[in-house]
Amino acid sequence: MHSRSCLPPLLLLLLVLLGSGVQGCPSGCQCNQPQTVFCTARQGTTVPRDVPPDTVGLYIFENGITTLDVGCFAGLPGLQLLDLSQNQITSLPGGIFQPLVNLSNLDLTANKLHEISNETFRGLRRLERLYLGKNRIRHIQPGAFDALDRLLELKLPDNELRVLPPLHLPRLLLLDLSHNSIPALEAGILDTANVEALRLAGLGLRQLDEGLFGRLLNLHDLDVSDNQLEHMPSVIQGLRGLTRLRLAGNTRIAQIRPEDLAGLTALQELDVSNLSLQALPSDLSSLFPRLRLLAAARNPFNCLCPLSWFGPWVRENHVVLASPEETRCHFPPKNAGRLLLDLDYADFGCPVTTTTATVPTIRSTIREPTLSTSSQAPTWPSLTEPTTQASTVLSTAPPTMRPAPQPQDCPASICLNGGSCRLGARHHWECLCPEGFIGLYCESPVEQGMKPSSIPDTPRPPPLLPLSIEPVSPTSLRVKLQRYLQGNTVQLRSLRLTYRNLSGPDKRLVTLRLPASLAEYTVTQLRPNATYSICVTPLGAGRTPEGEEACGEANTSQAVRSNHAPVTQAREGNLPLLIAPALAAVLLAVLAAAGAAYCVRRARATSTAQDKGQVGPGTGPLELEGVKAPLEPGSKATEGGGEALSGGPECEVPLMGYPGPSLQGVLPAKHYI
């Protein structure tokens, strides 16, 4: 009796344990990591149905999905990351993501979406990152993103937008609208007070409205490259906290005046490449005392004496010049094509100058200079009753350039919410945040119950070393990835590799996703003799934030011409050499055909005349010469040959098969003879 009463509970417990273990991985997917499902390159038009309910990360990119059925995400309340990129999705039903109450990352890049409605992202109260780039979005309803009050990143590049609705996103840190067709942005359209990075490249902007950036007090990274700006926008002067400014590709800008960029003392990276500049302001040191990266390639520089300061300034201030091999002189003719950094002072054609040096005569004792522990240059004490004496020196050497003093004060209002600014060990400012706030600029409040991993720590880790890139062939570059295999304490999900051609007209960014286990990767299908910028970003597992982006530049080698050159090369340089033999062969073939036809007709006439003299068909002169031999294996000919060759086009058949040595390789291709 006792054993019978215990049997049903034991069976019930066994069934429960087996039921929990049967919960497997969806077909065509991988579940190697806990609470993570990878369905990469799975061929299916719908979302897999049998996803475990405790899944935190679901990756179903490049699956061929065309539609999202209502209820396809039901039963996944703990899902935090959903990757639906590189599919064929054309529309999103209203409320399709509403069951995903804990979703924080949604990637819909590279689909075929046309519209975003007010109901598309309903219920996603915890969403922090939304990627909608490389779609066909033409219309976004006003208020489509208003409910996403926790959104930190919104990416809409490479779409077909013509009008942008007002955006009210108080916590947004990154907004990417690049490569749409939005020729104008009205003032007040961006209600994003905390945005740090704003990318407006390739919109077709002709000007920037004066009030466009009025509320963006936290803006540090501005990209307005590849637009149609005709002059430096004056609205940029008010962005005192700007550290990175990209103006490349605005080919109508022909001049930069010092007052155009006045007040940007915090600027560290400036990109003015591919403009129409013939010179640069000589007081860049005072304008940008913290500048460490300058891109000025593909400008028609006039390398005369007013530009002689550039090379010494770059070297003395340790400024990194991006793409120095493309920063060349266009004028005057003697310097055309030369690298700007390779020119000496005398190469700029500066006249022999008479320099008046002021030599102070000191009556009092000169004390030793006071050395400061800061990065500022040593200062000399004031001198007592100095008198000056002028001495004239004839010199052709460049004027001595004093290094720019390092500023000791931080930009105004750079730290938010009461944070204090200070200079770090490398003379880069950093913010000390008060209790209750966090972030690089103290921009994010620490909320109760919020995980610290969702907000970047302060200060940020030091940037990675530059990438190691080496050329493999004229169309490929090899990127070394060993750094992500050795000594990495963060569990990596994958690597994101992006590259773009800096030399050609198409500068669109190409994005690849690589496994984290690769030691190196070869980027193929590149253009020869071109400069490429390649960046790699490690992607952490789960909710771990992205690592620092490591970038580098490399050149593909020159294409080598050989005896086995492809057809595309022969079209450019060797086209006449190929046409001349072909024309000669055609001419010889025509002459040979005409001569043979003439002989056949004359022989036929002779044979007709001899028929009256009882001469048999087998003893004709054409048969003795062997002209009729090719007719036997060819088309059906009569024994006499006279009927088959009389009149009509049949007489041309033996000419096509005539075994002439000079025309053997040409005649088969000439079917029109």
Swiss-Prot record:
Residues 25-53 form the LRRNT domain. Residues 463-559 form the Fibronectin type-III domain. Keywords: Disulfide bond, EGF-like domain, Glycoprotein, Leucine-rich repeat, Membrane, Repeat, Signal, Transmembrane, Transmembrane helix. The chain crosses the membrane at residues 577-597. The keyword Heme does not apply. Disulfide bonds join C410-C421, C415-C431, C433-C442. Residues 299-352 form the LRRCT domain. Residues 1-24 form the signal peptide. Residues 369-389, 608-648 are annotated as: Disordered. Its main location: membrane. One of its GO terms (cellular component) is mitochondrion. Residues 598-673 are cytoplasmic. The keyword rRNA-binding does not apply. Induction: Upon retinoic acid-induced differentiation of smooth muscle cells in vitro. It is found in: Membrane. PROSITE patterns: EGF_1, EGF_2, EGF_3, FN3, LRR. May act as an inhibitor of TGF-beta signaling. This is Vasorin. It comes from Mus musculus. The gene is Vasn.
